[in-house]
Each structure stands twice: as C-alpha cells, then as structure tokens.
C-alpha cells in the first residue's frame, strides 16, 4: 500500500477549528462498504506514512476496525484526530448513537462528531425520509451532547450541508459547526459552498 513516493510525502497542512484544535486538512477516509475488515490494511498504511486525521461513520460499519488499528499503531491518542458521524436514521437518538460509536471505536474520546446528512430517515429504513425531525432539532441534540458528554466529544459539525441548509442551521445554532465536511471534485464542484 505505501510506496516510496507516499512515504516521502509532506505532512498536509493543518487548520484550527473553532474549538482551538488543530486538524489535518487531509484526512484518511475509511469508507469501505460491505467489508469492514477490508479497511484495515489501508489504515495501517496511513498510520505509517503520517496521516493523523481519520474519518469514519456509523454507516460504514467499521468503527471497531478503525479504533483497533489506531490503538495498535502506537501513535499517541493526542496526536490523532478521529471523526465519526451520526447516521440519518439516528436523528431522534443522537446521544445513544454517539455512545455506540464511542464504544465501537473503543477510544477515550471522539474529536469530531458530525451529522452525516441533513435529512433524517426512518429508523431501520435508511432510504425512507423522516420529516418528523428537522436537522435543526438534531443539531440541538448535538449541542446538548457537548454538555452531557463533555470530554468524550471535543467538537461537533455537519457533513453534506448545502449553503441553504447551513444558512438555515446557523440561524438557530448556539454552537457554530466546527466543520462542514463535503464531497468536492471535478465532477462535483459546488463553488458557492466552497467559498
């Protein structure tokens, strides 16, 4: 997995989020659908070439594997930045979902807990929209999580929010999201959002 070119790569720049934490601007994405153990060699290689930011999610069903590899890496926990995400069918139960993720990762804390998508789905039916809860209500639960799980979650944020949804959220947020993790590439250029 690691090539000499990768091993000589420079460590990516970091940015400071609103909590004061430094986050690598390049993270190792752990999405590997249908094969949780299949991500292990990639994470092992990433730890050896200097990645410090690891991104997983409840949806990926590999939080256990991510945590296992990171603990075995020998990298001090404070040198790592671990992001995981609340899945769409857990918008009604943010705290319970967070606890499951923390237990699966088996780490002392999670650096960043994101709302994976603004649209909730019916529990157990990940593709059926649930309009009984708004992303604003879900965000309020995430804000509460910062209080009830102080020290166990360092920052909260969102993922896949558009300018419209982010603007709406900011009208109601007491805590500004520390991150809006988005997909961007030549075939998906949301220039207004990236600005």
Residue ranges and their predicted role:
Residues 28, 54, 66, 82, ...:
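Conserved, mostly hydrophobic/aromatic
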Residues 77-90, 112-118, 181-184:
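A short, structured active-site edge motif that brings together acidic residues
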Residues 39, 63-73, 94-103, 158-175, ...:
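Distinct, well-ordered alpha-helical segments
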Residues 5-80, 95, 108, 144-147:
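N-terminal binding-site loop/beta-alpha segment at the start of enzyme catalytic domains
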Residues 91-139:
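Glycine/small-residue-rich loop that forms an oxyanion/phosphate-binding "nest" at active or ligand-binding sites
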Residues 35, 118-195:
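Beta/alpha (TIM)-barrel catalytic core signal, keyed to glycine-rich beta->alpha loops juxtaposed to Asp/Glu
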Residues 2-6, 192-195:
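Short, intrinsically disordered, charge-balanced linker/junction segments flanking boundaries
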Residues 26-37, 85-93, 125-131:
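Active-site mouth loops of central-metabolism enzymes
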């Amino acid at each position: 997995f690691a090539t000499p070119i990768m091993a000589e790569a420079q460590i990516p720049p970091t940015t400071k989020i609103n909590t004061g934490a430094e986050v690598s601007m390049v993270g190792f994405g752990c999405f590997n659908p249908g094969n949780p153990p299949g991500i292990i060699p990639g994470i092992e290689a990433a730890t050896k070439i200097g990645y410090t930011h690891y991104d997983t999610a409840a949806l990926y069903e590999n939080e256990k594997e991510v945590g296992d590899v990171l603990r075995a890496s020998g990298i001090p926990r404070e040198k790592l930045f671990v992001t995981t995400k609340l899945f769409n069918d857990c918008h009604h139960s943010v705290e319970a979902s967070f606890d499951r993720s923390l237990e699966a990762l088996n780490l002392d804390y999670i650096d960043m807990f994101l709302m994976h998508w603004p649209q909730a789905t019916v529990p157990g039916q990940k593709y059926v929209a649930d309009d009984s809860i708004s992303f604003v209500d879900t965000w309020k639960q995430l804000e509460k999580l910062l209080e009830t799980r102080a020290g166990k979650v360092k920052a909260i944020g969102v993922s896949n929010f558009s300018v419209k949804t982010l603007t709406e959220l900011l009208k109601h947020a007491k805590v500004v999201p520390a991150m809006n993790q988005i997909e961007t590439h030549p075939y998906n250029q949301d220039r207004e959002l990236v600005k």
